[in-house]
């Protein structure tokens, strides 16, 4: 493996595993797909067999040149040599996103594809522990993501599926976009609210009486078991108390 690869990656090379992943993506021949990380082009090739068009973004020069040579005759594939964190997804076109992403960039990339793209469905291969953190509504990331997408696990991918073999297991997850739970005009207030909420800085958000009213309205008996829906209710109370609604 080239030691100069920009972002340390673990590659999927097993035909069996790649086919299992493709099956889970439920792609159609009319789909346009943006792939994060071309790698060696194994998944790219399979995506292009089904989809109408695949645009694959790869930062590493060695991998880009390698995959460019491999895929140069494939008219359904467009390769882009760029950092995915700097890439601008289209605003009007309908598309899906697929990616086997570097573990250490998982948070940055998932925020990028959720908040800076209009993809209807997003499929990512991530570290299993990271997937669990995306579901945790006691964390900032979980509370932000849930406003835009629902998240589900599609496939478990043991460490043995990758080369080089990582120290952790991975999962294929699907993020399905839904109507936002927080309108744009309230987004900055929501991010502020979440930053204080997860750190339990309730006094920065409410007076003592307001806090009790918000808890009562949301039917919260125990803050350790609060649900996402209850947090949204508490946020709406925060807006009301501050004359924003």
Swiss-Prot record:
GO molecular function term, any single one: 23S rRNA (adenine(2085)-N(6))-dimethyltransferase activity
Gene3D superfamilies given in the database record: Ribosomal RNA adenine dimethylase-like, domain 2 (1.10.8.100), Vaccinia Virus protein VP39 (3.40.50.150)
Catalysed reactions listed for this entry: adenosine(2085) in 23S rRNA + 2 S-adenosyl-L-methionine = N(6)-dimethyladenosine(2085) in 23S rRNA + 2 S-adenosyl-L-homocysteine + 2 H(+)
Tree of life domain: Bacteria
Keyword Metal-binding: no
GO CC term (a single one): cytosol
Pfam families: RrnaAD
Keywords, ordered alphabetically: Antibiotic resistance, Methyltransferase, Plasmid, RNA-binding, S-adenosyl-L-methionine, Transferase, Transposable element
InterPro entries assigned: KsgA/Erm, rRNA_Ade_diMease-like_C, rRNA_Ade_Mease_Trfase_CS, rRNA_Ade_methylase_Trfase_N, SAM-dependent_MTases_sf
Enzyme class: transferase
Enzyme Commission numbers on file: 2.1.1.184
Any GO BP annotation: response to antibiotic
Residues engaged in binding S-adenosyl-L-methionine: 10, 12, 37, 58, 83, 100
Similarity remark: Belongs to the class I-like SAM-binding methyltransferase superfamily. rRNA adenine N(6)-methyltransferase family.
Function field: This protein produces a dimethylation of the adenine residue at position 2085 in 23S rRNA, resulting in reduced affinity between ribosomes and macrolide-lincosamide-streptogramin B antibiotics.
PANTHER family associated with the record: DIMETHYLADENOSINE TRANSFERASE (PTHR11727), DIMETHYLADENOSINE TRANSFERASE-RELATED (PTHR11727:SF7)
Protein name: rRNA adenine N-6-methyltransferase
Organism whose genome encodes this protein: Enterococcus faecalis (strain ATCC 700802 / V583)
């Amino acid at each position: 493996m080239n030691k100069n690869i920009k972002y340390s990656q673990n590659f999927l090379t097993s035909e069996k595993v790649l086919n299992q992943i493709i099956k889970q993506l439920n792609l159609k021949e009319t789909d346009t797909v943006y792939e994060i990380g071309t790698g060696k082009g194994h998944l790219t090739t399979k995506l292009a067999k089904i989809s109408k068009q695949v645009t694959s973004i790869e930062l590493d020069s060695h991998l880009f040149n390698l995959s460019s040579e491999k895929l140069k005759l494939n008219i359904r594939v467009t390769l882009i040599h760029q950092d995915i964190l700097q890439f601008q997804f289209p605003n009007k076109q309908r598309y899906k996103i697929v990616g086997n992403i570097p573990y250490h960039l998982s948070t940055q990339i998932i925020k990028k594809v959720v908040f800076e793209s209009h993809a209807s469905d997003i499929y990512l291969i991530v570290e299993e522990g990271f997937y669990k953190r995306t579901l945790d509504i006691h964390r900032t990331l979980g509370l932000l993501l849930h406003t835009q997408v629902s998240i589900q696990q599609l496939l478990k991918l043991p460490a043995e599926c990758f080369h080089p073999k990582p120290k952790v297991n991975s999962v294929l997850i699907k993020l399905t976009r839904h109507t936002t739970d927080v309108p744009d005009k309230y987004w900055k207030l929501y991010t502020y609210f979440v930053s204080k909420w997860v750190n339990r800085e309730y006094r920065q958000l409410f007076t003592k009486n307001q806090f009790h009213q918000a808890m009562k309205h949301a039917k919260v008996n125990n803050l350790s078991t609060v649900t996402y829906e209850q947090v949204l209710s508490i946020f709406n109370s925060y807006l009301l108390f501050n004359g924003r609604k």
